[in-house]
Amino acid sequence: MALFVGYILLISRMPDIRRVFMYHGAEHKSVHVWEADEPLDVDHARPKTTAHPRCGTSLILIALATSFVVFAVVLPFVPRVFESDAAHAVFLLVIKLPLLLPIAGLAYELQRMAAKNPDNGLVRALIAPGMLFQRLTTREPGDPELEVALAALRKTVWREQQDSGPVKSDASVEVFPSFAAVDAQLPLAA
């Protein structure tokens, strides 16, 4: 866990990663606006928080904590079948790998439960580390980052409303001369 946190702290000093973290914060603000059923525009997004209970960062933290608990419960009962340390390590890896699926599933369900019951004290305690960890992986975005996140969300909402199936392969990359041109193409533009 300390290695993961240290890695995030280290890369967060890089200017490009700081910008990525600003987009991450903008994504959260956009989702907060959408969940509040407010207009998807910068003025409504700006005051929202950059922390979100269903963040992937929180999910990673929940999955790590869940894996620690599961492995602490399961691995002591695994007999040592090989005398060689290397062979035993491989054997433990073979046992741990299939456990990753239920660990990920349990972490996902814990996060869903947290999102459905955000006012419950136990749930708040469960998600508190993830919410704190988001302080490392999000930064306060500027208006340009908010515009991009809101445009992406508007396009996503529009696509879901259209239920038009898969995106055509020839339309997978579109180039626009400016952000205003992108915004003008979006049906839900503010």
Predicted regions and their residues:
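Polar-ligand-bearing catalytic/cofactor-coordination segments
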Residues: 1, 5-59, 113-118, 122-190
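Alpha-helical transmembrane segments of multi-pass membrane proteins
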Residues: 1-12, 67-71, 100-112
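Hydrophobic, aromatic-rich alpha-helical transmembrane segments
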Residues: 52-57, 85-97
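Juxtamembrane "helix exit" motif at the C-terminal ends of alpha-helical transmembrane segments
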Residues: 63-93, 104, 108
